[in-house]
Each structure stands twice: as C-alpha cells, then as structure tokens.
C-alpha cells in the first residue's frame, strides 16, 4: 500500500493503517479552538517538546483555548511555512529507542504566520486578546545577550534598527515584535501576555525579561514600567534530544508507518519540562500532562544547572572533540572506549561535585540516564547539530563549571580540554586534514581570532561578550587550555585523550 499524504482528510486512514504504532489527534482544530499560544521559532525542538505537551492538553484534557499559532521571523522559515501549509499544519513525531519506534501525528499547531510576508499580521496576532502566551525558541543568539556585561547588545545593527521608532511596524528581531505587540496591548488596556522562553539557557525567563525591559526603556519608559510591573517571564528547564531530520527518516516513516510527511521530527522517548508558575494572563493545566510546574524559581535554576552542565556540557565534550576526530554521530563517539570513559569521568569528577543537591533527584541515576540517551543508536544524532552555534553554548555549558572549579580549587582539566577542542574546532579542519562547515553567528570573528592565536587561546579569550575577565586572566586556566590546544594540534584528539583519563 502506498503511503498516505499527511493531511486532515487522511487522518482516519493513517490511524487505521498504522494500527497501534500510530497516534493521531481526534480533537477539533482550526476554527473550533482559540490560539492562546503564539510561538516564535518553529523548529525541530519546539515540535518535539512544547507542541507535544500542548497536543496532550488538547487530546487528553480537552483544552480548546491554547492551540498554537507558529511564527517564523527569518527568511529561511519559509521552508517550515511551506511544509506545514501542505499538510494542514500537521506533522509527525517519530519516537525511537532500542525497544522500537512509534509515530505520533501532532495537531496542536493550528496556523502559521511568516513574518517577512506580513509583519503586521504577526504583531496583530500577539496583540489579540486571545493570545495569552508568546513562547520562544530563538536560540541563544536571538536574545542579543552580552555574556560578559549581562546587558542587551544595543549596538547590534538589528537592535538599532528596531529601536528606531520609524521601524516600529516592521521589526526584525523578536524583541522588536514583542515590544510592538505589548505596546499595542498597553494602549488597549489589555493584560500583557506571558513571554515564555523555551530555549536551552540558564535563567532563560530572567534573561528574556531583562532584555525586553532594556529594549522597551529605549522606546517608551511607561511601557517598560508596565511590562516590569505586570509582565511575566517564567524560568524553565527544557529537555529532549531532537536531531535534524534526514531524507532517510522521511523514507522510513513512509515505509514503516505509511505516512508521507514533508518534514517529520525524530526524537527520543525522554522528555522533561520544569517551569516556574509565573504567568500574567492565565495558563493551561500543564501539570496534568507531565510538566513539573514549580512555585520557586530557585528549584528551576537547580534543575537548569544540572541539565546544562551535565547533559549539554557532555554534549560539548562529545561534539567538538568528536568531530575533530572524524566521527559523525553522538552514539558513534560514545561507542569509543576513550570517549565514553572521558565523558563519564568529566561528569563524575569535575561537574557533579559542583552541583547542588535537589530533593528527590539522584545525580548518579541522572548521569546513567544521560549515558543511556547518548548511546541510543536509533535517533542518529548528528555531531554538526550538537556543535551548532557554539558561541552561545560553550559560555553556558562549560565555562561556568571551569570558573567555579577555579574558585573552589577543584579539578577542571577535562573541562579545559573541551574548551581547547572547541577553540581548535573553530578552524574547521579535522585531525585528518578534512575541512568541515562551522556554523556560528560569530563565525568571522571567531575564525579570525583562532587563526591569529594559533595554539594560544588569548586571542579567542579576548572576545569580551563571551568570556569574563576572571577566566581570561587566570594562569591555571590559560596553562591548561594552551597545553591541550598544543597537544590536540600536534597529536590529534584520540592520541591526546588518554592524558585526561584515569
């Protein structure tokens, strides 16, 4: 039987053909529901995480006023627009593990707006009273957050453009759109919508608040004051490994489940979301569908710290050295005995001792779960995805552990090796001399500094919006990173790794 094109009309046939291996939405969509969530940045992670939770709300709890309107701000988002439009905004989540795979058609995205076509439509949608939450997955670089000063990058050309009142109705950045919509709601006497970051950053809600308030103060102090007093920016920890979708994944979906989907999502069974209970205009009952809703922001921060430093820090330890060594996938790296020992020892000896205890959480169990997830061969998690946009990741995932270790005189050699591997990775040449693509919003500056510095990290460490003065001037850190860079450059990753394994 030929695969069925994914659309609303074919859902019942897709369900019947897939038997127990395929789930489809049975709730009402389109005009029968309100779009209470506007989501900026509809990529793989959003479709495997927040959109799945909202699908559960609609399917299991009968929620009808929190469907999602997706928004794409960038020209490349036209690909997502076209993919969703061709199948009534439906898509398939393929969940894979060693136990097998199953497919879940998600219907929580009810519509999609492409900002380059109509920026006013996006502003009007966010200003609509039905919109209670505007959620974000815009990656670290989308926040224009200076890691060194902890302030908005007001000098950035896109921020400068959006701060000009002449451009209020044609913004480029997320903050330009948020401000324009909130200013309109302020004039209309409406409550501000909750701005809910779903990005993988520590204190994501607090950073979002600070950046938006800083932006708003430049435009209208009264609106900024209203946002500060009435707005809500919950902090959250999000987790689900979501590799890039390949042509092979689409073919497997058609052959194994009978679904023709132009852009499915592949992911793992594990999914977690811890969010602060801070909303300005209501929220759905997230806690009823597996979300950990907590009153205390401190609890969120502790979960965030565990996840960012253990999971994402380990991903960095797998990604940059792994790509330099010529590997392609996360599970391939972890199958190598040197890497598996290195990652485990870094977690146990250098990261874990610096982490706070969380009641009810066993850190060793969490570490074992991470190893199990990293070694899952079925999701084929690509190293280039792990390595993407490192300038927004390394300062969060690796450098804070190094800084704390220096402060308390704890071991940090393996963490320095990871930092050194990234510095070498920036040049885009692996240990066999093969070139690979480096994708980073700061690529030109990073590569210029990397070439100028050679095996000396000082040039890269001089980038002040990435690295603080505490690391830049610490002789122990400089010594460890320089030595690791020299060894990696001379001998390669696999010959250098044994020096970092007990």
From Swiss-Prot:
GO terms for molecular function: mannitol 2-dehydrogenase activity; mannitol dehydrogenase activity. It comes from Aspergillus clavatus (strain ATCC 1007 / CBS 513.65 / DSM 816 / NCTC 3887 / NRRL 1 / QM 1276 / 107). Disulfide bonds: none annotated. The keyword NAD applies. Keywords: NAD, Oxidoreductase. This is Mannitol 2-dehydrogenase. Its EC number is 1.1.1.67. Belongs to the mannitol dehydrogenase family.
């Amino acid at each position: 039987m030929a695969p069925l094109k994914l659309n609303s009309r074919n859902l019942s046939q897709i369900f019947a053909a897939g038997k127990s291996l395929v789930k489809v939405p049975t709730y009402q969509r389109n005009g029968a529901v309100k779009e209470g969530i506007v989501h900026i940045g509809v990529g793989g992670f959003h479709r495997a995480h927040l959109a799945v939770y909202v699908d559960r709300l609609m399917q299991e709890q009968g929620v009808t006023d929190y469907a999602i309107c997706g928004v794409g701000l960038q020209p490349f988002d036209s690909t997502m627009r076209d993919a969703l439009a061709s199948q009534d905004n439906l898509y398939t989540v393929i969940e894979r593990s060693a136990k097998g795979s199953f497919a879940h058609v998600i219907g929580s995205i009810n519509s999609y707006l492409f900002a380059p076509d109509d920026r006013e439509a996006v502003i009007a949608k966010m200003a609509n009273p039905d919109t209670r939450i505007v959620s974000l997955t815009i990656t670290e670089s989308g926040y224009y957050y200076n890691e060194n000063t902890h302030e908005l990058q007001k000098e950035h050309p896109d921020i400068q453009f959006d701060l000009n009142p002449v451009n209020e109705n044609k913004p480029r950045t997320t903050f330009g759109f948020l401000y324009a919509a909130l200013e309109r709601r302020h004039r209309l006497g409406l409550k501000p919508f909750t701005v809910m970051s779903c990005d993988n950053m520590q204190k994501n809600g607090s950073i979002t608040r600070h950046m938006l308030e800083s932006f708003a103060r430049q435009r209208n102090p009264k609106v900024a004051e209203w946002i500060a007093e009435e707005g809500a920016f919950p902090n959250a920890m999000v987790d689900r490994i979501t590799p890039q979708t390949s042509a092979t994944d689409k073919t497997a979906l058609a052959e194994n489940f009978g679904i023709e989907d132009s852009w499915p999502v592949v992911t793992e069974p594990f999914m977690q979301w811890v969010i602060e209970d801070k909303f300005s205009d209501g929220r759905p009952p997230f806690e009823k569908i597996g979300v950990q809703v907590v009153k205390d922001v401190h609890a969120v921060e502790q979960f965030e710290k565990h996840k960012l430093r253990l999971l994402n820090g380990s991903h960095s330890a797998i990604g940059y050295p792994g790509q330099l060594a010529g590997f392609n996938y996360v599970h391939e790296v972890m199958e190598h005995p040197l890497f598996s020992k290195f990652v485990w020892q870094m977690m146990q000896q250098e990261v874990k001792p610096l982490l706070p205890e969380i009641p009810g959480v066993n850190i060793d169990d969490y570490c074992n779960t991470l190893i199990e997830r990293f070694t899952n061969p079925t999701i084929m998690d690509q190293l280039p995805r792990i390595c993407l946009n490192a300038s927004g990741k390394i300062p969060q995932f690796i450098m804070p552990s190094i800084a704390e270790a220096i402060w308390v005189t704890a071991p940090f050699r393996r963490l320095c090796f990871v930092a050194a591997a990234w510095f070498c990775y920036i040049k885009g040449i692996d240990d066999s001399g093969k070139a690979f693509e480096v994708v980073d919003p700061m690529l030109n500056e990073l590569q210029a500094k990397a070439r100028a510095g050679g095996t000396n990290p000082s040039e890269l460490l001089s980038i002040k919006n990435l690295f603080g003065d505490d690391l830049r001037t610490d002789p122990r850190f400089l010594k460890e990173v320089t030595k690791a860079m020299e060894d990696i450059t001379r001998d390669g990753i696999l010959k250098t790794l044994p020096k970092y394994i007990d």
